[in-house]
Amino acid sequence: MTKEEKAIIIQEVAQKIAGAATFYITDGSGMTVDQVNKFRKLCFSKGVEYKVVKNSLIKKALQQLNIDHTALNGAALKGASGLMFSDTANVPAKLLKQFHKGGVAKPEFKGASVFADFYVGKDKLDALASIKSKEELIGDIIALLQAPAQRVIGGLTNESRVFAEQA
């Protein structure tokens, strides 16, 4: 790979990192071609972009964006790495868990950047999968706002029924 090709890849990765709210780093080494194709199709169906990139190019892209990536320098940026880009924080984590349920251990979660916070290690995958999306949070707020009104309506209906029985 020439320096020009590397510079283009660094620029692409930097743009994707800057444009996405979330990126995950995975290890897909040892996956068969069929497994990689199935994983890419699943990513595409969920709106997640998956790209295999050399660790040195990932580091240079992060440096270009002035992002302190020291938390990722350990296990996250060692070995083969694939990047997953998403605007929803929990979708890549849920996608990885769903793919693993099919009996495939790879790709392994190595680390993630969610809204500029770094999460490194396999033990963080469950926590990332449990993060609620914007739509889920809005649904929870609407349900909380509707609950008092439903209680008032229920109370009024009950009182009118009691009043009708007495009359």
UniProtKB/Swiss-Prot annotation:
One of its GO terms (cellular component) is large ribosomal subunit. Keywords: Ribonucleoprotein, Ribosomal protein, RNA-binding, rRNA-binding. GO terms for molecular function: large ribosomal subunit rRNA binding; structural constituent of ribosome. Gene3D superfamilies: 3.30.70.1730. It comes from the Bacteria. One of its GO terms (biological process) is translation. InterPro entries: Ribosomal_uL10, Ribosomal_uL10-like_sf, Ribosomal_uL10_bac, Ribosomal_uL10_bac_type, Ribosomal_uL10_CS_bac. Part of the ribosomal stalk of the 50S ribosomal subunit. The N-terminus interacts with L11 and the large rRNA to form the base of the stalk. The C-terminus forms an elongated spine to which L12 dimers bind in a sequential fashion forming a multimeric L10(L12)X complex. Belongs to the universal ribosomal protein uL10 family. Forms part of the ribosomal stalk, playing a central role in the interaction of the ribosome with GTP-bound translation factors. PANTHER family: 39S RIBOSOMAL PROTEIN L10, MITOCHONDRIAL. This is Large ribosomal subunit protein uL10.
